[in-house]
Every structure is written in structure tokens, then in C-alpha cells.
Amino acid sequence: EALTHFQSRDAVFLSSAREGGVVIWNSPELYDQLHLIQLLSWYNSEAGRHCQPPELVLVPFLLGLATEEHDLPECLNQRQVVSTEQLQVAEEAWYALTASNPRMLAAMLKQDLSCLPYLKSGLQRLAEEYPDLNGINRTERQILSILSGGESAPGSVFRDSQQLESPQFMGDSSFWLVIKRMVESDTPLIALADG
């Protein structure tokens, strides 16, 4: 299902890129950052270099939660053509993210990424999903902390975990997969009350 979604997204994107006039809306959450570096990396590739560069709208709020007070038409008026520097940084970030060695991501975080203002914080948060010396990642630590505080209702655990994130880090489906992995691993981190 996810593959079909991305294939459909890519087909729409490629068609639009060839026609020109692409405007990418981007907000701080990691999901948007990953889409942004993937798309801009394509524009910086051999296939994308002949296309008109896209325009970028950077907004400091979650697009899915936008209200009238966010004045989306004014945000659109602030759009700017993506710069060569932004294309290069995006390509390097995408390469580091998709590399088999996580040290490339760590090295990327030492670079100046300010031309894509939300990228560094998104990649830093993603890097926290690598296990620490105890073998667990940040999301798992947050879940264990919330559970040890007495909360056990699944929706509340998700909500409480999201309150520890700025900006929002993952959606509910991804979160439930983390919990499932914690319950079903060879050495479970969570035991369900009903077994």
C-alpha cells in the first residue's frame, strides 16, 4: 500500500515537474523534511536538472493543522525559487539518509543546513531513533517513561508521547508499530495485561 502511494505521488510529481510551476509547501515535521530532500535531490539529479526549479513555501506550523489565522494565501506569496545551495544540501542529505552507514547522517548533522531551516532539527530527531547504549531509541524511552508513570490507555500514551515532541515526530500508525515491536520482540520491553 505504501509503495503504491509513493508510486502515485512520484507519477504526479514527475508530470508536474516536467510542466513546471511546482510549489512545495514545507513545514517543520520530519515527514515533510524527508519529502523535501527527496524531491529536491531529484531536481539536482541528471533527470531533474532540465526542469524549471520548484518554488518553496516554508511555514513554521503543521500544514494539517492550519487555520484561517495562518493566512495561507500570504504564505504562498512568500514563496521563493529553490536555490542551487538548497538543491545541493538536499541531495547531500538524501544521500546521507539513504546510505547504509548511519555515520553519514551523523556527519551531515555537523554541516551548515540553514538554507533549509527545518532540516537539521528533523534529521537530529531522526538520529535519536538509533538505539542508545541501552539498546533502545528515544521513542521507546518515551513510551517506557509514560507507561512507568501509570498511563496505559493506548491513545493517551500516543498523545503524551507527542507532547514530548516538537514538532510532531510520527503519526499514530508508525507509533503503534513501535509499540507492537516492543511487545513482540524476543526480549519484550512491554508486557500486555491480558497476555
Spell out what each predicted region is.
Residues D32-L40, L65-D71, F169:
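A short acidic (Asp/Glu
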Residues E151-Q162, G171:
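Short acidic, hydrophobic short linear motifs in intrinsically disordered regions
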Residues Q162-D194:
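Charge-enriched amphipathic alpha-helical scaffolds
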